[in-house]
Structure formats: structure tokens, C-alpha cells
Design a protein with these regions (language model features):
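Glycine-rich FAD pyrophosphate-binding loop
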Residues: 23-44, 181-190
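Glycine-rich Rossmann-fold phosphate-binding loop(s) that bind the pyrophosphate
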Residues: 10-14, 162-164
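A conserved FAD-binding loop/helix module that cradles the flavin
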Residues: 168-170, 292-336
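FAD-site-proximal beta/loop scaffold in flavoenzymes
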Residues: 133-152, 246, 250-304, 311
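Conserved N-terminal glycine-rich FAD pyrophosphate-binding loop of Rossmann-like flavoproteins
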Residues: 36-60, 193-198
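Rossmann-like NAD(P)H-binding beta-loop-alpha module
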Residues: 23, 36, 154-177
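A Rossmann-like FAD-binding core segment of flavoenzymes
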Residues: 70-104, 109-112, 123, 175-276, ...
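FAD-binding core/adjacent interface of flavoenzyme oxidoreductases
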Residues: 1-9, 25, 30, 37, ...
Length: 345
């Protein structure tokens, strides 16, 4: 059974930055994530979407951001367990400061002084079209629920369903890549950002995008691979066949907290309540950082999660080293920190 200072649930940006802050203080970490890759929603849902609000980095894609964080934590000792979910937490009170026994869905067990919940919005899965039986039979055969690579749609006839931010964002983003785009929504009104909707409607005026409202999907066309879809006018009930190479269903996500909701910690608005000094939950030794937590003034931004986990790691150090002062130094001038980072002899 492996013993660590911090067990981190979630390998997204905030979970990765936790490894960095912990490494500066000499704390050992392990990361657990139920996805099959590191990066959380950034890698799974929008790897090629740009991020503009990371301090000092004017523009980078979500995947570039994840890659930069992985590069940043290379000097530190940590392990990653993917395709696993934390199933059970059991407090171990045999020492002055208790530890946590953590068991995963694969049966792996860990003892950790602190547990950081950095699970973003929890586990998530895309919403399927409600009227279609088994749309996943065409998964990776023309149907997708997110954009992993923009190049996949180059010179393709693309059909996008949805009326929120993702549908509008990708309609605008892919307009210069796809051969043609038809955006289908069941209402004339959209739920996305007004500025993006304006951009989309400008593309409609120029003929780069065809807008079909109010329409809903009625059926899929194809045998081995997707060949198109049948859509129905919501008002007239008339149907129409649309031929296409690719379909993007962008109806949003179903979010689930999973076992986190059963751990007996205080919740608010389906998020984990924390204090704003240590970002500790109502249970000692359990911390929540990033989009999973809630407190007055909370903003669901990556940079806020970085701030939260930086302070939380200070308390994790105290738990692993009772009675010791938390060391503090600037990476620009502290030779011990620079040695840990591998930037000095």
C-alpha cells in the first residue's frame, strides 16, 4: 500500500498545478483520474479551443496549457493512475494527525495525509440526442460529441446540432476549415454568448454557414458510417434529408459528482463547501480546489484554482510535517527551490 503526502482526485490543470506546489515543498503526490488521459476537460472536451486568461500567456490552446503544466512538473516525484475512480475514503486515526485510506475502482489502495478533490465539475458525459436510439453505433464513424482535432473536419460537409456556447463556438471556429456547415437548432433563439451568435449570423449572411431553425433531429442515415440525418421542422412537422460526412452533437454535458456526494462533506449548489484560508472541506484533511468547490465570490476559472491549491498545499505540508514551519521562498532567488526545479547545479 503506497503512502503519499497528497492524493489528488482529478488530473486537470488544477490537479497538475497541485503537484507543482507540493513539489516545491518536498511533498509526494499521486493523481487519480477516471479519464484515459491527463488534462481533464481541457484535453477531453476542448483540446484545441484557445485560452486567453492565463497570466503571462496571452494565447494557448487547452492542450498546450496541459502540456506546459506537465513540463512544469517534470522535476517532481508523482504517479498517475488513469481510468480509475476513487470509490472509498476511510479515515485512519492511529496517529496525532489522521491519514486517509483511499481505495480506487481498480482495487488500488493508498494512505495519504491529505486528499485534494480537484475533479472539476465532477464526472461528465455528453448528452445524447433524445429521439435517436443508440447514436453511439456511429461513434468515431462520423458522430462525435466534442472536437478533439479541427483537422478532422477539413473539407468535410459538417452537420452541427445544438444551441449553446459549444455549438456556436465550433460553428465559428470550423467555418474556415469545413467544406460546408449546417447548424441545426430547435429554436430561433440561442443560449450562447451574444458576441459569438453575432459572428455565427454574419457567417450565415456570407453563405459560409447554413442555419436551420426550428429543426430537430428525427433519424440518422448510414449503415457502417454516418451518411447524413433526417431533420424535422418543429413547427410544420415536415422532414428533410441532409447528406453529410460528419455530425457533431453539442447538447452539453450531464454532470455527476459520483461518490464525492456520499462522503459526508458539506455541499452547496452541488459543489463542495470550503473555507477560504486553507480551502479545506468540512472534514479535516480533505481539500477541494478548482471548479468542484464553492465559497462566497467563487469564480470557475483555472487561475482561481491555481490560487486555491497554492494555499491548500500549505496546510497539507503542516499535516505531513506537524510542528514544522512551512518553508517559503521565491523561485527567482531561492537556490534550494531552483535545485528542485533543476535550473541550478
Amino acid at each position: 500500500m503506497k503512502k503519499v503526502d497528497i492524493l489528488i482526485i482529478g488530473a486537470g490543470p488544477v490537479g497538475l498545478f497541485t503537484v507543482f506546489e507540493a513539489g516545491l515543498l518536498g511533498l509526494e503526490c499521486v493523481l487519480i483520474d477516471n479519464l484515459d488521459k491527463i488534462g481533464g476537460q481541457c484535453s477531453e472536451l476542448y483540446p484545441e479551443k484557445p485560452i486567453y486568461d492565463i497570466p503571462g500567456v496571452p494565447n494557448q490552446t487547452a492542450q498546450e496549457h496541459v502540456d506546459a503544466l506537465l513540463k512544469q512538473i517534470e522535476p517532481f516525484n508523482y504517479e498517475v493512475f488513469l481510468n480509475e475512480r476513487v470509490e472509498a475514503l476511510e479515515e485512519q486515526k492511529n496517529e496525532e494527525i489522521s491519514s486517509w485510506k483511499v481505495t480506487t475502482s481498480d482495487g488500488n489502495e493508498f494512505i495519504s495525509k491529505s486528499v485534494f478533490i480537484a475533479a472539476g465539475a465532477g464526472s461528465f458525459e455528453p448528452r445524447r440526442p433524445p429521439s435517436i436510439e443508440d447514436p453511439d453505433r456511429f461513434l468515431n464513424k462520423g458522430i462525435s460529441y466534442s472536437v478533439k482535432s479541427k483537422e478532422k473536419y477539413r473539407d468535410k460537409d459538417l452537420l452541427i446540432f445544438g444551441g449553446g456556447d459549444s455549438a456556436l463556438d465550433w460553428t465559428v471556429e470550423l467555418a474556415g476549415i469545413a467544406k460546408s456547415i449546417k447548424l441545426v437548432h430547435r429554436r430561433d433563439e440561442f443560449r450562447g454568448a451574444p458576441n459569438t451568435e453575432t459572428q455565427m449570423r454574419e457567417l450565415v449572411k456570407t453563405g459560409k454557414v447554413e442555419l436551420k431553425t426550428p429543426y430537430v433531429i428525427e433519424n440518422l442515415l448510414g449503415i457502417e458510417n454516418i451518411e447524413g440525418a433526417i431533420v424535422k421542422n418543429f413547427d410544420t412537422k415536415e422532414t428533410e434529408e441532409i447528406q453529410c460526412d460528419e455530425i457533431l452533437f453539442l447538447f452539453g454535458l450531464n454532470k455527476k459528482l459520483g461518490p464525492i456526494a456520499e462522503w459526508g462533506i458539506d455541499m452547496h449548489n452541488k459543489k463542495v463547501s470550503v473555507d477560504t484560508e486553507k480551502f479545506e472541506t468540512s472534514t479535516k484533511g480533505l481539500f477541494a480546489v478548482g471548479d468542484i468547490n464553492d465559497y462566497p465570490g467563487k469564480l470557475d476559472l483555472i487561475l482561481c484554482g491555481f490560487h486555491e491549491t497554492t494555499l491548500a498545499v500549505q496546510e497539507a505540508f503542516r499535516r505531513s510535517n506537524p510542528g514544522e514551519r512551512v518553508p517559503f521562498g521565491y523561485t527567482t532567488s531561492n537556490t534550494k527551490l531552483q535545485k528542485k526545479l533543476g535550473v541550478t547545479d
